[in-house]
Curated annotation (Swiss-Prot):
Protein species of origin: Idiomarina loihiensis (strain ATCC BAA-735 / DSM 15497 / L2-TR)
GO biological process terms, semicolon-separated: proteolysis involved in protein catabolic process
InterPro entries: ATP-dep_Prtase_HsIV_su, Ntn_hydrolases_N, Proteasome_sua/b, Proteasome_suB-type
Name of the protein this chain belongs to: ATP-dependent protease subunit HslV
Lineage: Bacteria, Pseudomonadati, Pseudomonadota, Gammaproteobacteria, Alteromonadales
Enzyme Commission number: 3.4.25.2
PANTHER family the record matches: ATP-DEPENDENT PROTEASE SUBUNIT HSLV (PTHR32194:SF0), METALLOPROTEASE TLDD (PTHR32194)
Length: 185
């Protein structure tokens, strides 16, 4: 598997992932690029799960983004509909974490589209470790989004055997409201 984590803080949204590709209990590749920019570099996307499956989903998702002029939510919902109804797509085992300047979403293999609480996404085998680390850093530090993603991936890589330290991190400007400081005094 892998670890993908996304954080939105201040005027940035960041997605990062590790580079390990495993086949069973064997590391096949250590420098895979599981985080990419889509739709004229305006959408960030990362995947966890089967590599070939994820590339198929990336292609489909980018096609939906083009079809809906970069509307992230609409493209995600349309991809999820296809995923649920297309027999070939239903067999794909992957998760996508996607974000643009306004929205962060998880698209699941069950065809669900989830907008996570506080725009914090962590998927893959190291996801729970990265999510815990990122949440603690969001709530207890003033680190920027990129530093939080980097530290969360490092912590996940130290704990999860299916996650390595080779990180790919992409960031984009954000205009969404920063929910991490709401209700705090």
């Amino acid at each position: 598997m892998t670890t993908i984590v996304s954080v939105r803080r201040g005027d940035k949204v960041v997605i990062g992932g590790d580079g390990q590709v495993s086949l069973g209990n064997t590391v096949m590749k250590g420098n895979a690029r599981k985080v990419r920019r889509l739709y004229h570099d305006k959408v960030l996307a990362g995947f966890a799960g089967g590599t070939a499956d994820a590339f198929t989903l990336f292609e489909r998702f980018e096609s939906k983004l083009e079809q809906h002029q970069g509307n992230l939510m609409r493209a995600a919902v349309e991809l999820a509909k296809d995923w649920r109804t297309d027999r070939a797509l239903r067999r794909l085992e992957a998760l996508l974490a996607v974000a643009d300047k306004e929205t962060s979403l998880i698209i699941t293999g069950n065809g669900d589209v989830v907008q996570p609480e506080n725009d914090l996404i962590a998927i893959g085998s190291g996801g729970p470790f990265a999510q815990s680390a990122a949440r603690a850093l969001l709530e207890n530090t003033d680190l920027n989004a990129r530093d939080i993603v980097q530290k969360a991936l490092t912590i996940a890589g130290d704990i999860c055997v299916y996650t390595n330290g080779n990180q790919t991190i992409e960031e984009e400007e954000s205009i969404a409201e920063d929910k991490t400081k709401q209700g705090k005094k």
